[in-house]
């Protein structure tokens, strides 16, 4: 079991029930809120204790249902799982401070694939770091944070 932060950043309302049922199968109950960045969609953030295999299963289910999400898993091997309907799933290893880690074996593979081209190496590193996923998920994150930071009227 590991501390797991599940943030369904954007899910079509038509998929919310199925995602909710999938979460309930892990004894998790989402509190759906509108996603201000995209009309007709919802979001939810849930803290959980889940095994690695359950996190993998959940992320595969959510991507099939068209959700954009991120799951931070603080297990013996911390990771960040990013999901976007247009890009699919991306699993990133994290260090103790939450920074993305590219392991030596991965780096060696990237160097070989780049074939001596600096621009190709830079492109491959961006893919390995999940830059495209992070860029596409950021507007949902920011929209959610802006809404929660608005002052309440008295």
Q: What function would you assign to each model-found segment?
A:
Residues 1, 36-47:
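Short glycine-rich, basic-tinged beta-strand/loop micro-motifs
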Residues 30-38, 62:
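Short, exposed beta-strand/loop patches in secreted or surface proteins that constitute
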Residues 20-22, 35, 58, 81:
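Generic alpha-helix signal with a bias toward terminal, lower-confidence helices
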Residues 46-154:
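Charged interaction segments
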Residues 1-32:
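Short, extreme N-terminal segment that most often corresponds to the first beta-strand
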Residues 6-8, 19, 23, 44-46, ...:
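Hydrophobic beta-strand residues in large extracellular and virion-surface proteins
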